[in-house]
UniProtKB/Swiss-Prot annotation:
Protein name: Large ribosomal subunit protein bL35
Annotated region (Disordered), positions in chain: 1-47
Keyword Transport among record annotations: no
Biased composition (Polar residues): 26-35
Alphabetic keyword roster: Ribonucleoprotein, Ribosomal protein
Record Pfam families: Ribosomal_L35p
Sample GO molecular function, one term: structural constituent of ribosome
Keyword Plastid among record annotations: no
């Protein structure tokens, strides 16, 4: 059996934690920041865990990470 290819876009966006969950960063942080409040920008800096519904599909995209 050949190796499964890693989806390079997903590899740059997601990381697996030690417990096997998948971590992601928030969107809406790259530009047009003047209209966003200080509080909103601060909260967007924190990372979060991918929803349970999406875990399986994303794990398939990054098999070796």
């Amino acid at each position: 059996m050949p190796k499964i290819k890693t989806n390079r876009g997903a590899a740059k966006r997601f990381r697996k934690t030690a417990s096997g969950k998948i971590k992601r960063n928030s969107a809406f942080t790259s530009h047009i920041l003047t209209s966003k409040t200080r509080k909103r920008k601060r909260q967007l800096r924190s990372s979060s865990i991918v929803a349970a519904v999406d875990q399986k599909n994303i794990a398939r995209l990054i098999p070796y990470k």
